[in-house]
Amino acid sequence: MTLDECVFCNILKGIVPESVVYDDEKVLAFMDIQPVNPGRVLVIPKVHASGLSNLDEETGAHMFKVGMRVAEAVKRSGVKCDGVNLLLSDGRAAFQEIFHVHLHVIPRFEGDSLHISFGRKYGLKPERNELDRIAAKIRDALH
């Protein structure tokens, strides 16, 4: 996908209309045009980054800070909201559909239509040595 084809870049350029919730020098938060629940907001960086590995940590942290503030605002706004999911899908296997990093702020309420499933293996606890082995691999990759 080229930058000209990125819908979020086109929103940032003013080519595609949006309903702004929050705007600063690093991020834009706007209403999702295909909300699973009313009040769903997307927070995007103003610099194109197709995935988290292409986004600087400062901007990523700022996105989550803004997402947290928006989540609290949604709760206070009068929109039906008993809880909030903050969701960021990174990569095709994680169901990322638009390859410009974006954070979903999803209002939740009892009986809404959104279902998050962790699969059949959820609840099966691995052995501690397996958890330790994986933790060591991740810890080593952090350095």
Per-region residue spans from a language model:
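HIT superfamily nucleotide-processing domains
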Residues: 1-143
